[in-house]
């Protein structure tokens, strides 16, 4: 197996391909990307057989922006016989992997592939049983073992491969399943909720998304992102010249500042979270976030960068590198992650966590 399959949002295959080619080159691993527009996935074929496995071990999945999932696959299995689709799939995995912890039978995130989902769900049970009999799959699911992926791109045609559970997306098809809350003021609320799931480990939610924390939402109206903060019992400064949702204002947890988000400055040093979803040039938003972090006005930030029509990966990489250098020059040690989330469209979501000095600070310092 010398190929890597990367799932992505349809229409962003070129960005996904540019990114994996760049990351592989940094590891001195070379190959070429196969791209089909609006397919929802990219294949990167390595020149050296063993390099595919090395790539999915050594490239941190959390550092990939446009990939929803990353796995090693073999050659495309075509025209699987309807009377026995299982044997060719199991045969692909003999000698490649054993005692895997989970099986996922998946499809690309396209309208055409959605018709295959019903088949995938039915097919998973007999395929799982066959893999367990062959000792390719453990009897019980184990989150610490590799994941087997069977990726159907058309009826009777699939890629078979695996990912490592410590360096992949834990979500089926790489997509968190979130339900839109009926009382939220806009669907944009799902972007921030997904960002929390993707960027913050669940065992740290009680500390980093705790009730009583103070937050600022720049470009808040009507309150989709503020809703997520209020739901977690935070106190929120909502900054926008527009109108906020009455139900959010009625909670008593929101203070509305009718000010331009680029001009607002907090009056106190107790802000933990800064969130921002404003329609503005990426460079301008990036600079605003740098200013907040260097000034010590927040501890963590989640914000969106709107994407240009062309050279989207290059523009994103440039802005993130610029942010990294400016924070470093400002004496700030920070963790930066970016992802093209499922609920993002022509934008990416960035998370920055400022790392404070080595001594333990009290909660009141935030």
Swiss-Prot record:
S-adenosyl-L-methionine binds at residues 188, 221-224, 240, 260, 277. It comes from the Bacteria. GO terms for molecular function: S-adenosylmethionine-dependent methyltransferase activity. GO terms for biological process: methylation; rRNA processing. It catalyses: cytidine(2498) in 23S rRNA + S-adenosyl-L-methionine = 2'-O-methylcytidine(2498) in 23S rRNA + S-adenosyl-L-homocysteine + H(+). Keywords: Cytoplasm, Methyltransferase, rRNA processing, S-adenosyl-L-methionine, Transferase. Its main location: cytoplasm. GO terms for cellular component: cytoplasm. Its EC number is 2.1.1.186. The keyword Manganese does not apply. Gene3D superfamilies: 3.30.2300.20, 3.30.70.2810, Vaccinia Virus protein VP39. Pfam families: FtsJ, RlmM_FDX, RLMM_N. The active site is at 306 (proton acceptor). It is found in: Cytoplasm. Belongs to the class I-like SAM-binding methyltransferase superfamily. RNA methyltransferase RlmE family. RlmM subfamily. HAMAP family: 23SrRNA_methyltr_M (MF_01551). Catalyzes the 2'-O-methylation at nucleotide C2498 in 23S rRNA. PANTHER family: RIBOSOMAL RNA LARGE SUBUNIT METHYLTRANSFERASE M, RIBOSOMAL RNA METHYLTRANSFERASE FTSJ DOMAIN-CONTAINING PROTEIN. Monomer. This is Ribosomal RNA large subunit methyltransferase M. The lineage of its organism: Bacteria, Pseudomonadati, Pseudomonadota, Gammaproteobacteria, Enterobacterales. The gene is rlmM.
